[in-house]
Amino acid sequence: MTNRSQNAGLTEDQKAFYQENGYVILTRVFSPTECQDFVTHMEELQNGRKQLEHFGQHSNYGSRTFNQHLYDPWALDFLIHPRLARPLADCMGDEAEAIQTMHFYQGSEHPRHQDQYYLPDCMSAWIAMVDVTDTNGPLCLQPGSHRGRLITKRDVSKEFSL
């Protein structure tokens, strides 16, 4: 894991790690203060202390929001920030096109899956806005799975090894 400097791209070692394993972990892409401020923003929207046009129309999914960047400048700033865009471009070999955001108010347990099943030719970036522990929603990755075939829903319902 690596602490991030402002607007830094990936090192050659990080690029090689990504090519081999299909992921790279960067720490402190955003500061704890930036993350906590956004968490507070989201809590205030959810409990009605703060108003944002269109928020109610898109927040009826229980514990998460979808595509908030379309109507919330703060979410858009995170999505297109150079500290996120540069490492993505280094992994992809070209500038990334941001297409989707999701914010989870609490743990977001999901069964094993590949995001590319839902969004072909995509790369995902996960920003943990709070400290992650073994009990509050860690992200599990399978090194090298990017070189295997795409997992289908039928595969997930049975024992499956990449």
Regions found by a protein language model. Give the residues of each.
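Conserved hydrophobic/aromatic beta-strand scaffold that supports enzyme active sites
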Residues: 7, 23-25, 124-128, 138-141
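Short, charged/polar surface micro-motifs in flexible loops or helix N-caps
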Residues: 84, 94, 131-135, 147
